UniProtKB/Swiss-Prot annotation:
Role summary: Plays a role in lysosome motility. In neurons, mediates the anterograde axonal long-range transport of presynaptic lysosome-related vesicles required for presynaptic biogenesis and synaptic function. May play a role in chromosome segregation.
Protein's UniProt name: ADP-ribosylation factor-like protein 8A
Species whose genome carries this gene: Gallus gallus
Keyword field: Cell cycle, Cell division, Cell projection, Chromosome partition, Cytoplasm, Cytoskeleton, Endosome, GTP-binding, Lysosome, Membrane, Mitosis, Nucleotide-binding, Protein transport, Synapse, Transport
Location(s), subcellular: Late endosome membrane; Lysosome membrane; Cytoplasm, Cytoskeleton, Spindle; Cell projection, Axon
GO cellular component terms attached to this protein's record: axon cytoplasm; late endosome membrane; lysosomal membrane; spindle; synapse
Taxonomic lineage: Eukaryota, Metazoa, Chordata, Craniata, Vertebrata
Residues that span the membrane, as ranges: none
Amino acid sequence: MLALFNKLLDWFRALFWKEEMELTLVGLQYSGKTTFVNVIASGQFNEDMIPTVGFNMRKITKGNVTIKLWDIGGQPRFRSMWERYCRGVSAIVYMVDAADQEKIEASKNELHNLLDKPQLQGIPVLVLGNKRDLPGALDEKELIEKMNLSAIQDREICCYSISCKEKDNIDITLQWLIQHSKSRRS
């Protein structure tokens, strides 16, 4: 009975209140950050992406949730900006190229360095291992191990294996983010 009441209450809220969340998307260059933004915004995959110079901001509406998404460049010269754009967001989305095992160590180090910043304490993190459609791509369990995600104890952390190209697990990723925007305000 309580579950039915909560669903009815959520439906009623959706009629009258829009929810907003702010996310920052970071990760090494060529991991698929901008592709992810395009796929969730339009459902379209484009093979010919140009690397993000600096940052892009995009607003995406999914149902009654408006997502303000900061897509920050992953080249070394832009990584010092990551912390600034991660402050005060609902969640940090950290993109990893799961098929490029040569960059996993660097990706792990950048993630842990970012999360060591006191200003980002407690902000939840969603790690996405992109390009699962490619041969040799790490699965979720391997990503958790190689990225040393179990060492992150001061915040909620979640990891999914996705493919922007095949649109694998994009829906569950969005569900986690939207649910998370609700729990952050409660």
